[in-house]
Regions:
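Hydrophobic alpha-helical bundle cores within soluble ligand-binding/oligomerization subdomains
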Residues: 1-227
């Protein structure tokens, strides 16, 4: 007979094949690579590819991946209008959850009725949508900052890296290269933290074959909770 565990306390949800964390020893690895090495030698774009694909990219693969991220940074005016209608006093996480959930309405690009069963077509769809959401996430945050200040959001710059473009859109001016690199490292350090509450929420939502925008919106809502940590 299975013992009842309220709140799943002490019950392992799953084992991560993506990252390993040992807080006591100060160890964090992504796909077997030490975080200190990635922070020193990698970029956020390369690290994101590593997390999504499982292996570090070749030069050609990284160029193609980076191009995809740059191509999908822009968001439709419909998303801008939705964000503009939100109260500027609202919490940024509430805005982000709303905006990400709305992406699925304007950028469906989905496998017909929603993903009937797992398979190659589904994996390609999820991978493509993950890239699109990742590309637009920083844009949404930067747009919200400008809207809160009463400004019109800055246009994205495809000549800038992911981190540099975020800072440019967020602050309204091109960042110093050192500041952009610091932001890049911050993105690397926060890219993956094993099976926490928001990851678990994403796994539960994804297990129903919900679209990626729903999955990430659920994770954002969980991340916003004060007990998440």
């Amino acid at each position: 007979m299975t013992e009842y565990q309220p709140g799943l306390e002490g019950v392992p949800a799953t084992r991560s094949n993506i990252s390993y964390l040992d807080g006591k020893q100060g160890i964090l690895t992504y796909r077997g690579y030490r975080i200190v090495d990635l922070a020193e030698h990698s970029t956020f774009e390369e690290t994101a590819y590593l997390l999504l694909d499982g292996e570090l990219p070749t030069v050609a693969q990284l160029e193609r991946f980076d191009t995809q991220l740059r191509e999908h940074r822009r968001v439709k005016y419909n998303i801008h209008d939705i964000m503009k209608s939100l109260p500027v006093t609202g919490h940024p996480m509430e805005m982000l959850q709303t905006a990400v959930a709305s992406l699925g309405m304007f950028y469906p690009n989905h496998v017909p009725v929603q993903i009937r069963s797992p398979g190659d077509e589904t994996e390609q769809y999820v991978y493509g949508q993950s890239i699109r959401i990742l590309a637009r996430m920083a844009t949404l945050v930067a747009m919200w900052q400008q809207l809160r200040l009463g400004n019109y959001p800055m246009r994205q710059r495809r000549d800038l890296s992911y981190a540099a473009n975020f800072l440019y859109m967020f602050n309204g001016e091109e960042p110093d290269p050192l500041v952009a690199r610091i932001m890049d490292v911050c993105f690397i350090l926060h890219a993956e933290h094993t099976i926490n509450a928001s990851t678990f929420a994403a796994m539960v939502t994804g297990s129903t074959l919900a679209s990626p925008s729903y999955v990430i919106a659920a994770a954002i809502g969980t991340l916003a909770g004060p007990l998440h940590g």
